[in-house]
């Protein structure tokens, strides 16, 4: 039976870039389940991709807020739609991602795959993340993006979040969910059908879990990791044992900082440049360009991000030509 890959894509702008991403991945084994932020007009995306039989736009869209639970809700809806159509593996992407391995290479990889490709860490191993679950964050009610900017027109947003972060340490802390260990990790992952089935059933059977994460910070970077890593699926996660050894070594040496984390790329096969966290030379994460060519060529990853259609134009053409075998 042919390997079936469902690509789940969250996008909010740049319809032509989304078209290019779909074209780079499109093949007989692929289906696409796309969520377009409800804040934007979906018609430009439908005009470009709506007539493709294997492209399915989510009809019950959500207003997607950066760092909000709305992003988890959009992902859950895409997962449910993809599961109804059937797949062997699903791959979660953003509209600013792009493959750096050919379609043939991706299919060959997933035909042999027997793991869950999701990067993770225990919040105990990354203490700077603990606040994300220790306080109530009403991000979907009061969007947090750019709240401190002088261009922010809604004064009460600046006031609320400014006061929140100033006095947060004095607020009572939430108790984490009983019987679970808190995990985090990047949004972007590749999961098998049976693992996704488990996740969807867990969410349905445990409504309190969803309620808890609705008021956390960046739940999309914790929600799925915590379900999977607290289940029998944990041992199927790529590099699970390596993480355990690394974590034990840190504990033995009483290391409690965020430094020297294992590379996410070793778990989820996604290339992202975070050098901007320690240098002002690039954004966080970096918009990739020709400077990144050698790193992409040497990467084991399947996908990279972020790409911009203008700033990454030369790099994208080179990826098409030399890595994906797509003629111009």
Kindly give the residue locations of the regions a language model identified.
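ER/Golgi luminal nucleotide-sugar-dependent glycosyltransferases, focusing on the catalytic module
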Residues: 1-328
């Amino acid at each position: 039976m042919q390997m079936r890959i469902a690509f789940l894509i969250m996008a909010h702008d740049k319809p032509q870039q989304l078209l290019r991403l779909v074209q780079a991945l499109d093949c007989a084994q692929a289906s696409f389940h796309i969520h377009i932020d409800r804040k934007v007009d979906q018609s430009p995306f439908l005009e470009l991709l709506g007539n493709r039989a294997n492209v399915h736009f989510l009809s019950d869209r959500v207003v997607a807020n950066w760092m909000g639970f709305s992003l988890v809700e959009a992902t859950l809806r895409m997962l449910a739609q993809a599961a109804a159509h059937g797949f062997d593996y699903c791959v979660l992407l953003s509209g600013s991602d792009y493959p750096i391995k050919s379609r043939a290479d991706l299919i060959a990889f997933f035909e042999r795959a027997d793991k869950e490709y999701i990067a993770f860490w225990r919040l105990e191993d990354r203490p700077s993340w603990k606040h994300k679950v220790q306080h109530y964050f009403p991000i979907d009610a009061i969007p947090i993006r750019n709240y401190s900017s002088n261009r922010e027109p809604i004064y009460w947003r600046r006031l609320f979040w400014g006061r929140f972060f100033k006095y947060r340490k004095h607020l009572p802390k939430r108790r984490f969910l009983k019987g679970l260990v808190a995990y985090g990790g990047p949004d972007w992952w590749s999961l098998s059908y049976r693992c996704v089935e488990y996740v969807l059933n867990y969410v349905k059977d445990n409504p309190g879990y969803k309620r808890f994460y609705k008021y956390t910070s960046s739940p999309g970077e914790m929600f799925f990791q915590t379900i999977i890593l607290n289940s029998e699926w944990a041992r199927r996660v790529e590099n699970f044992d390596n993480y355990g050894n690394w974590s034990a070594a840190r504990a033995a040496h009483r290391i409690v900082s965020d430094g020297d984390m294992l590379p996410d790329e070793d778990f989820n096969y996604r290339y992202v440049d975070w050098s901007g966290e320690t240098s002002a030379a690039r954004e966080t994460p970096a918009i990739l360009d020709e400077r990144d060519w050698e790193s992409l060529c040497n990467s084991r990853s399947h996908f990279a991000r972020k790409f911009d259609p203008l700033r990454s134009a030369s790099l994208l053409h080179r990826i098409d030509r030399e890595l994906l075998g797509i003629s111009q």
